[in-house]
């Protein structure tokens, strides 16, 4: 069956339908990863987005039980050049097509993803829709241009109830803004006792859990939409060590007076080179974000620790006076290189230092 991809600017791409037989709309973005499609599709940071994979062949090792970043993916669609109808991998349980059908996510293949990516790079991310052949392009485009993207993504993906992942090590409260399971795995490997709490949890509720440290997770959307989270961070910093990742990084920076802005097309993939400004060390990182921390009017209480090599985006900050730091990239690296997984050890060491001084 033929399927059409329509962009807000009027661009139309025709391809073959695969995945779920439904129509959809959302913000279209692109990811430059060669592999890791399962982790990307199940990453809640893609909530409400149609993912374009720039690598030409996707799905060649199928879907397996180990690489989920969430059980219920909330991306809106998948755009690829070619999907592997007959994947081969000893871990696979189903094909990409079967997985998308199971999760109700439509896909389109046979698209010139290079041309599509050039449009997004030039004009920025925009609204898009997937419709089946036979429907009115004019009507679909008119409805798309009138539509409004929702800004309550974190409300959709954050846990509604607190839950624990038992361990014998540090007591960590993990604030869920759209948590990736790989963050849980990294903390569990360090024997942490983890309590995952909703994004609406107050500072006092966190303090009542007597945590050794607080981790602010990744998540979708605009940090401007979370004033309560900013207040929570302001009230706990200095009392408990803090580590922020992705959305958690943006919220931590904003809570200390930094500004954030929407990027033209964002960073999505796991080949982004980041420089540690103090040591000069360059790491390749996994990233998925459409907003970033601005250097403009940068607050006195923070200093920049990392920057992206190509566009100088702020990739990490640290507090001058409190035991707290954050990074824009994903040190859990799922998918992606493990160059920066040491930051979880740095978080644990920061907790030890804070407790010794206290």
Swiss-Prot record:
One of its GO terms (molecular function) is carbamoyl-phosphate synthase (glutamine-hydrolyzing) activity. Keywords: Amino-acid biosynthesis, Arginine biosynthesis, ATP-binding, Glutamine amidotransferase, Ligase, Nucleotide-binding, Pyrimidine biosynthesis. Pathway: Amino-acid biosynthesis; L-arginine biosynthesis; carbamoyl phosphate from bicarbonate: step 1/1; Pyrimidine metabolism; UMP biosynthesis via de novo pathway; (S)-dihydroorotate from bicarbonate: step 1/3. GO terms for biological process: 'de novo' pyrimidine nucleobase biosynthetic process; 'de novo' UMP biosynthetic process; glutamine metabolic process; L-arginine biosynthetic process. InterPro entries: Anth_synth/Amidotransfase (IPR050472), CarbamoylP_synth_ssu (IPR006274), CarbamoylP_synth_ssu_N (IPR002474), CarbP_synth_ssu_N_sf (IPR036480), Class_I_gatase-like (IPR029062), CPSase_GATase1 (IPR035686), GATASE (IPR017926). Small subunit of the glutamine-dependent carbamoyl phosphate synthetase (CPSase). CPSase catalyzes the formation of carbamoyl phosphate from the ammonia moiety of glutamine, carbonate, and phosphate donated by ATP, constituting the first step of 2 biosynthetic pathways, one leading to arginine and/or urea and the other to pyrimidine nucleotides. The small subunit (glutamine amidotransferase) binds and cleaves glutamine to supply the large subunit with the substrate ammonia. This is Carbamoyl phosphate synthase small chain. It catalyses: hydrogencarbonate + L-glutamine + 2 ATP + H2O = carbamoyl phosphate + L-glutamate + 2 ADP + phosphate + 2 H(+). Residues 1-168 are annotated as: CPSase. Residues 171-357 form the Glutamine amidotransferase type-1 domain. It holds the Pfam family CPSase_sm_chain. Belongs to the CarA family. The active site is at 246 (nucleophile), 330, 332. PANTHER family: CARBAMOYL-PHOSPHATE SYNTHASE SMALL CHAIN, MULTIFUNCTIONAL TRYPTOPHAN BIOSYNTHESIS PROTEIN-RELATED. L-glutamine binds at residues 45, 219, 221, 247, 250, 288, 290-291. It is an enzyme of class 6 (ligase).
């Amino acid at each position: 069956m033929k399927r059409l991809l329509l962009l807000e600017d009027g661009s139309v791409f025709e391809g073959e339908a695969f995945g779920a037989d439904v129509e959809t709309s959302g913000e279209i973005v692109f990811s430059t990863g060669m592999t890791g499609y399962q982790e990307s599709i199940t990453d809640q940071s893609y909530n409400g987005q149609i993912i374009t994979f720039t690598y030409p062949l996707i799905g060649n090792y199928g879907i397996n039980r180990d690489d989920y970043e969430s059980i219920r993916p909330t991306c809106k669609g998948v755009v690829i050049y070619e999907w592997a109808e007959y994947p081969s991998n000893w871990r696979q349980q189903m094909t990409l097509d079967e997985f998308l059908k199971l999760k109700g996510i439509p896909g389109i293949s046979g698209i010139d993803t290079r041309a599509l990516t050039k449009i997004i790079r030039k004009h920025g991310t925009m609204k898009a829709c997937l419709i089946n052949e036979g429907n009115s392009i004019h009507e679909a485009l008119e409805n798309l241009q009138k539509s409004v993207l929702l800004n309550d993504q974190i409300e959709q993906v954050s846990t509604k109830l607190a839950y624990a992942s038992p361990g014998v090590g540090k007591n960590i409260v993990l604030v869920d803004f759209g948590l990736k399971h790989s963050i849980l795995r990294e903390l569990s490997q360090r024997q942490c006792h983890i309590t995952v709490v909703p994004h609406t949890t107050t500072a006092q509720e966190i303090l009542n859990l007597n945590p050794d440290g607080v981790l602010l997770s990744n998540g979708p959307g605009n940090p401007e939409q979370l004033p309560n989270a900013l207040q929570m961070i302001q009230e706990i910093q200095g009392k408990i060590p803090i580590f922020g990742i992705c959305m958690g990084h943006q919220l931590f920076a904003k809570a200390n007076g930094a500004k954030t802005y929407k990027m033209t097309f964002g960073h999505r993939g796991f080949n982004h080179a980041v420089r540690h400004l103090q040591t000069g060390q360059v790491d390749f990182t996994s990233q998925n974000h459409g907003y970033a921390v601005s250097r403009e009017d940068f607050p006195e209480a923070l200093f920049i620790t990392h920057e992206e090599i190509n566009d100088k985006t702020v990739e990490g900050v640290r507090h001058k006076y409190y035991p707290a730091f954050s990074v824009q990239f994903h040190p859990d690296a799922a998918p992606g290189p493990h160059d920066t997984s040491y930051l979880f050890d740095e978080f644990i060491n920061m907790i030890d230092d804070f407790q010794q001084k206290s």
